[in-house]
Amino acid sequence: MKTKLLFLSLLGSFLAHAQTLQFKNLANMSAGRGAITSVIVNDNIYVSNGYLEKGGNANYIEKYNITDNKWSILNSTLLTKKFANSETYDNKIYIFNGWGNSHLEIVDLATNTITKGAVNRFYTGNAGSAIYNGKIYVFGGSGLSGAKSTVFSDKFQYYDIASNTWNPLPDMPTARETKGKIVNDKLYVIGGFNGTPSRLINVYDLKTNVWVNQYTMPSGISGHSLAVSGDKIFIVGGFNNQTFLAYFDTTTNKLHQLSSNMIPRRHAAAEIYNNKLYIIGGSTTSVTSSAIKSIQVADIN
């Protein structure tokens, strides 16, 4: 594996003249939830699972309609779990991972029914996932195949929706809990945790199936969420720096930090729709009662 090691220099605007995003509050979820996962379909955001402010893990999907600014419970028959993943394809939501969960649940949004997909032998919690050309790419995490959550994974695989099969890929350069997004045929795996917050951004070329680049951020970030707008990957919240907000420009490979009035949070969800960044749920401590109901939105133009 040939990997270029590059350090991300800070732009002048990073320190002195950082762009400011102004968030406004929207209708709250029915309950505070952390360690959630989300997808966006048309003008609806679907938030799955996570731990509840009153204790225990959620077994339902809550739908937020952006146009109406209203929440509704979509389905209450999911397996309970936290730190899971979800992706959407062809009006279905694919929900998988989460500590101790080897199942793949497929929610048909047209019928509100759930079917099971192929068993995921290499399940983890707090992993990253992204979808590309009918394949769901899954990487990193902890608690591989039922191991302790302090055991970090470098496993990389994809689920082929058409064939309902899980398939191996070259291991990640560094084992860690992490998040990632796909832009222009490349997977960007950003930050994470493997005992300390990670400063790494690893890049995987989906055309050549090779890990091609590695960048180093000025500081580590974990417990964050990601959302994509064009060539930019927005990085939201963090375990330690809970008001962290930045974007990584994949055309210049530079990181730009933003200032904002965002509510502090970690292990939240983030989505982008019509040039607006939505931040949902999360928590502020390891105590479940700190889980957040709030959804906020800011214009990113």
What spans do the regions from the language model cover?
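Bacterial Sec-dependent N-terminal signal peptides
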Residues: 1-22
